[in-house]
């Protein structure tokens, strides 16, 4: 569909975000909902990994958890790290049930959460994304230990399983205050982990230095999971517009409720809102470049037209522009 699109630099868009939106646009015919957008935004970065890698990572994280006496669990299964570790050990020793084997294979691509003491007394207000260099398991373990040493300040952190080693944010540290970024930097420096961090950071995050990205947490929006009667399950109503209606504000499209969503879900929320508007309004030229630029314009509006979003201004660090500006510069004065 978009093979003939000419992608021009735009001051409204960070180059990494423009690249992401270009890839999403190319896949637009297959995108059915916000969750599809999220999958592209998240950039899962799946790579080949085996249970030996997983077992080594889990054992190192368990050592850290035990040493510092932190809480921990697995993101999707919501199991405590020690329980999950026993399942993987059982699989490696060929004495596991089929269910345990399935769980263990699933852990390869999951996030492991480490809850620091402040996780129970403050709300995460910002995040630091860390891109870990190879060898992943060894270096991720070193970075995790460095973050654990910052327990007096940080909220929590999570470490991706070895099958997620291709992501740009394999480790994410959550901060109680944006000012605590300096604590993370110092912790990494004091722990001599310079060789463990490098490469690119996720779109929509400010690059502090190679391999280290920063952003404030998004505003309150629907959560992925809900807990009822002590049982945690997938929030099936998360994308139900009747349950979580969207409203148009000066800051773009926002839910009316007071819950939270992840950083990636927040941006998928905005991009999907722009795509919906583009699909609803667009009736026009066969010129693929103009079609693509109209899509970008609707995404730009969905983010709020200015620096896209007050909470995460790094996605679009540039100018505020109008439809007239876009017509002149990007639409070749074509009018819908």
PLM features per residue range, with description:
Residues 1-336:
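Structured alpha/beta or helical-core interaction and ligand-binding surfaces enriched in interleaved
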């Amino acid at each position: 569909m978009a093979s003939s699109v000419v992608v021009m630099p735009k001051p409204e868009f960070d180059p990494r975000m423009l690249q992401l939106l270009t890839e999403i646009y190319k896949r637009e015919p297959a995108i059915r909902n916000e969750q599809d957008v999220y999958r592209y935004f998240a950039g899962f970065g799946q790579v080949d990994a085996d249970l030996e890698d997983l077992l080594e990572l889990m054992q190192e994280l368990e050592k850290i958890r035990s040493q510092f006496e932190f809480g921990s669990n697995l993101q999707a299964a919501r199991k405590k790290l020690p329980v999950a570790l026993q399942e993987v050990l059982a699989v490696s020793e060929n004495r596991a049930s089929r269910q345990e084997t399935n769980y263990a294979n699933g852990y390869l691509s999951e996030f492991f959460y480490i809850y620091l003491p402040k996780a129970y007394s403050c709300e995460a207000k910002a995040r630091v994304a860390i891109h870990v260099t190879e060898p992943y398991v060894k270096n991720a373990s070193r970075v995790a230990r460095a973050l654990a040493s910052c327990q007096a300040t940080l909220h929590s952190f999570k470490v991706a399983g070895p099958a997620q080693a291709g992501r740009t944010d394999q480790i994410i540290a959550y901060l109680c205050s944006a000012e605590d970024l300096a604590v993370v930097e110092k912790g990494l420096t004091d722990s001599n982990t310079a060789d463990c961090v490098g490469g690119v950071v996720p779109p929509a995050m400010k690059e502090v230095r190679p391999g280290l990205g920063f952003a404030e947490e998004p505003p309150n929006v629907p959560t992925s999971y809900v807990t009822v009667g002590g049982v945690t399950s997938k929030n099936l109503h998360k994308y139900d517009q009747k349950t979580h209606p969207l409203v148009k504000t000066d800051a773009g499209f926002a839910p009316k409720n007071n819950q939270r969503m992840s950083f990636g879900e927040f941006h998928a929320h905005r991009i999907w809102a722009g795509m919906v508007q583009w699909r609803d309004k667009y009736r026009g030229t066969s010129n693929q470049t103009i079609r693509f630029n109209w899509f970008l314009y609707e995404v730009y509006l969905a983010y709020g037209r200015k620096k896209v979003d007050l909470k995460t201004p790094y996605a679009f660090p540039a100018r505020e522009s109008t439809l007239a500006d876009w017509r002149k510069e990007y639409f070749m004065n074509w009018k819908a």
